[in-house]
């Protein structure tokens, strides 16, 4: 007996147990509603998706070609449409995740309006967006199953046993739109207790994976901006522990923690690390400080000094009371950060880089893997990179190293459209196309994400529509550029009433009121023009 039929049988038994007062209840309708609402709580989702992510991590360890991917989504509808599209084109959601970007929460979801990525937005906007994303994905499940149920009723009415069997199999083997989410908690929005409290909210909303960074919470900057300030390892590890305790308290034992290091581009620290003996973690952190050796007689009022190897060292302190690291130490600090995080509870790493360069990432990962052989990265394929210019310059430099003639190119102007059809541009585009595959094969990247692609796609599509609609094209701009494309490409949203749940509501009306139901999907519904 199929899972669907088992649900019907279970509800039928309940109906019989409750006698005549349940005479209006149709067991098959109730079974359908149960199947459409597979995940009852966010914790159900977090546990289910954590198991998926752990399985994917193990599969990547065995075969680096099976990496995972995601796109950042700033609204539940965007996440829903992404997963509907993935199922339509690729037939499965396997290895495809959601990403929640703190940058987009700040820019698009705050009651204060657009904000920079500096943790100034309401922290509950983060957990709120996670809940919203999964609400929309659960609705996508309900909608797709509703279409299957409607088809099943039609097959039965037509006496088509083969079609009925086919649809029953599709119902039993239905793949949910619910997938893992990697959710950005920034630097934790405060101390370790604040981190724990927000992590709980995020997990309760459905997050199986939380990404946390080693910046100072109240000095936090976007990873691609200047002025980043890191914290000593002991402070960061306390927040990793806080997230782990939140997972364990809520029973999400497989919860995943991504430890992000911003040290490559961070030249400052807010404080000198506590150290108890030479070579301990605090001492290693302090060893990267930009210091000058002084004598006791040179000590000034309020000076901060450290003693290393019998020498008095005065760290360079800025007017902001921040301390400066030595230039050129970023990669060494990143490697230390990553090894330390993995040895103290993190599952995955995130190294924020200033450019997309497989060789640069690989060099750091190779050093990390000397200590932790299965170290894996989540990597930000960031829109903050000029991908075209970066890769054209990489190819230009490779051509020079190979002794090729590059006299036809100006390295500083390679973004120009005049180079689009050149050999250099074609080689660069191919390297962009294979960047994720190459990064996973050679640089330990388990998960590739784009942080804020849907921010840019929303702006681009709106610009294209406005450009024509408010000018000479008028309504043709919408019809030609949007609706006609939706119809021809099979975009489900062209039937927007159905996408918003109108047909589900109509079926519920029939469940609840029988033949007396007043439905919205009759012959006068304009959505019938799109069949």
Swiss-Prot record:
It comes from Pseudomonas aeruginosa (strain ATCC 15692 / DSM 22644 / CIP 104116 / JCM 14847 / LMG 12228 / 1C / PRS 101 / PAO1). It comes from the Bacteria. Involved in the metabolic adaptation in response to environmental changes. Catalyzes the reversible formation of succinate and glyoxylate from isocitrate, a key step of the glyoxylate cycle, which operates as an anaplerotic route for replenishing the tricarboxylic acid cycle during growth on fatty acid substrates. This is Isocitrate lyase. Pfam families: ICL (PF00463). Belongs to the isocitrate lyase/PEP mutase superfamily. Isocitrate lyase family. GO terms for molecular function: isocitrate lyase activity; metal ion binding. Gene3D superfamilies: Phosphoenolpyruvate-binding domains. Its cofactor is Mg(2+). Substrate binds at residues 101-103, 223-224, 380-384, 451. Mg(2+) binds at residue 184. The active site is at residue 222. Keywords: Glyoxylate bypass, Lyase, Magnesium, Metal-binding, Tricarboxylic acid cycle. Its EC number is 4.1.3.1. InterPro entries: ICL/PEPM, Isocitrate_lyase, Pyrv/PenolPyrv_kinase-like_dom, Pyrv_kinase-like_dom_sf. Homotetramer. One of its GO terms (biological process) is glyoxylate cycle. Pathway: Carbohydrate metabolism; glyoxylate cycle; (S)-malate from isocitrate: step 1/2. It catalyses: D-threo-isocitrate = glyoxylate + succinate.
């Amino acid at each position: 007996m199929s899972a669907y039929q088992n649900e019907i049988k279970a509800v039928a038994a309940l109906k019989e147990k409750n006698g005549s007062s349940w005479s209006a209840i149709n067991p098959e309708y109730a079974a359908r509603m149960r199947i459409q609402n597979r995940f009852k709580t966010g914790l159900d989702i977090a546990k289910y998706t954590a198991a998926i992510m752990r399985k994917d991590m193990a599969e990547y360890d065995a075969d680096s070609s099976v990496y995972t991917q995601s796109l950042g989504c700033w609204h539940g509808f965007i996440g829903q449409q992404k997963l509907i599209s993935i199922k339509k084109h690729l037939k499965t959601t396997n290895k495809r995740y959601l990403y929640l970007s703190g940058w987009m929460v700040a820019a698009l979801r705050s009651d204060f309006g657009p904000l920079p990525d500096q943790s100034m937005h309401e922290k509950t906007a983060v957990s709120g967006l996670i809940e919203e994303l999964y609400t929309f994905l659960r609705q996508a499940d309900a909608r797709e199953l509703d279409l299957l149920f409607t088809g099943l009723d039609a097959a039965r009415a037509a006496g088509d046993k083969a079609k009925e069997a086919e649809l029953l199999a599709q119902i039993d083997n239905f793949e949910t739109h619910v997938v893992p989410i990697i959710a950005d908690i920034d630097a934790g929005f405060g101390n370790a207790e604040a981190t724990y409290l927000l992590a709980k909210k995020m997990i309760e909303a459905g997050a199986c994976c939380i990404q946390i960074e080693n910046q100072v919470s109240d000095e936090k900057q976007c990873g691609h901006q200047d002025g980043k300030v890191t914290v000593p390892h002991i402070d960061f590890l306390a927040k990793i522990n806080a997230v782990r305790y939140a997972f364990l308290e809520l029973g999400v034992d497989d919860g995943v923690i991504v430890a992000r290091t911003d040290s490559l581009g961070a030249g400052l620290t807010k404080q000198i690390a506590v150290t108890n003996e030479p070579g301990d973690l605090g001492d290693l952190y302090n060893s990267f400080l930009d210091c000058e050796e002084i004598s006791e007689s040179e000590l000034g009022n309020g000076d901060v000094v450290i003693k290393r190897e019998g020498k008095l060292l005065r760290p360079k302190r800025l007017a902001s009371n921040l301390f400066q690291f030595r230039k050129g130490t970023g990669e060494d600090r990143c490697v230390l950060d990553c090894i330390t995080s993995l040895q103290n509870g993190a599952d995955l790493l995130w190294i924020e880089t200033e450019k997309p360069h497989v060789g640069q990432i690989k060099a750091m990962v190779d050093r990390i893997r000397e200590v932790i052989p299965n170290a894996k990265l989540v990597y930000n394929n960031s829109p903050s990179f000029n991908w075209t210019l970066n890769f054209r310059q990489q190819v230009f430099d490779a051509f020079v190293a190979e002794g090729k003639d590059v006299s036809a190119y100006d390295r500083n102007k390679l973004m120009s459209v005049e180079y689009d059809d050149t050999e250099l541009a074609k080689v660069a585009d191919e390297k962009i196309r294979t960047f994720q595959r190459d990064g996973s094969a050679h640089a330990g990247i388990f998960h590739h994400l784009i942080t804020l692609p849907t921010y840019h796609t929303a702006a681009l599509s709106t610009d294209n529509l406005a450009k024509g609609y408010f000018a000479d094209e008028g309504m043709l701009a919408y019809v030609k550029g949007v609706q006609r494309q939706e119809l021809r490409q099979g975009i489900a949203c062209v039937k927007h009433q159905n996408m918003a749940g109108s047909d589900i509501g109509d079926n519920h009306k029939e469940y609840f009121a029988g033949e007396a139901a007043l439905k919205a999907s009759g012959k006068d519904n304009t959505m019938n023009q799109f069949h």
